[in-house]
Amino acid sequence: MPELSVITANIDSPEWAELLVKSIRKFTSIDYEIIIIDNGSLPKNLIWLEKQEDIKLIKLSSNIGHGNAMDLGTQISRSKYVAFFDVDSHVQRPGWDKELIELYSGDDKIKLIGVIGPEHKPLHPPLFFYEKEFILENNISFKYLPRLSTDTAQKAYWDILNMGFKVERLEKGEKIYNCIGDEIHLNGKSTIYHMWYGTRFNENNPDKKKDKLDGYALEEHFKNKKQLFEHPKVIEILK
């Protein structure tokens, strides 16, 4: 039985999914499983994922949303701990897995580890780390509820606090990559990188793009994506 389930929600983002998966393989030392909830990608964008024997790929016919994918992934996971990543995030260094477990288990009050969000929401979605049993036993959902929250897992944040527990929020810090995005720090080190709007303009399936970027914004999107995938550390992960 694996100790950690690494889960992400994917839709038509093959290059981001590959980078995340390969970073998990490279930098994870404990026993783990990888679960990818695919929200209706085109067949051409699943070719690489379908060839990976160590990935449990759940292919859905339509997009159930990020929060629903978190709930589904948690339910089918087999591990004590769950690390749910944005698909356009990846791990930057070894030790991340044991350090998150140490942080979580070091305080009985901590029931969710996330990332400090912008002013209008308490959490940012590059990473959520939690214990499966606690989430399921307390019927905590990560669904996006428009009237109650501003993004995925915001209600879960308040539900956990209202139960008398704590949510540990990791900070963003100094960057290794010179790209638009956040580098999440753990124990003072860059540990997880999250590309801003990495999947917002979906060149792999333009019909499903979430936001229409044009002009300077579109130019910056592709420039930063190119810079990231040409960075020596990313090239090393993708080998």
What name fits each language-model region?
Residues 23-31:
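Short, acidic, metal-binding catalytic loop of nucleotide-sugar glycosyltransferases
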Residues 50-64:
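Conserved donor nucleotide-binding strand/loop of the catalytic core
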Residues 92-159:
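Conserved catalytic core of nucleotide-sugar-dependent glycosyltransferases
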Residues 148-239:
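C-terminal catalytic/acceptor-binding lobe
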